[in-house]
Amino acid sequence: MASLAALLPLLALLVLCRLDPAQAFVNQHLCGSHLVEALYLVCGERGFFYTPKSRREVEELQVGQAELGGGPGAGGLQPSALELALQKRGIVEQCCTSICSLYQLENYCN
């Protein structure tokens, strides 16, 4: 758990630059420890909900995707829009693979 002392330099930088914290996090790639620190900063005392997928779950998802189509131009079955919409988008997909905003991070706060 990140201590308040570890977050103080970041908070001081925000104050010195006179940036609104919401503007400081708009459209950022956040991965690994940077993602966790951003969640601590955004959620504060509320804490956050994060359950990373196990390696087995990730491998099963990759196998399932390969069986559906095997990638672009492979000629296999392509997933329907409904199947894509039903896939769970986690915080890693939202903030590390893609970019996310402060408001998307707040969705993971308790």
Curated annotation (Swiss-Prot):
Disulfide bonds: 31-96, 43-109, 95-100
Any one annotated GO CC term: extracellular space
GO molecular function: hormone activity; insulin receptor binding
Subcellular location: Secreted
Signal peptide: 1-24
UniProt record, GO biological process: cellular response to oxygen-containing compound; glucose homeostasis; glucose metabolic process; positive regulation of protein secretion
Stored PANTHER family: INSULIN, INSULIN/INSULIN GROWTH FACTOR
Job of this protein: Insulin decreases blood glucose concentration. It increases cell permeability to monosaccharides, amino acids and fatty acids. It accelerates glycolysis, the pentose phosphate cycle, and glycogen synthesis in liver.
Record-given protein name: Insulin
Organism field: Oryctolagus cuniculus (Rabbit)
Gene: INS
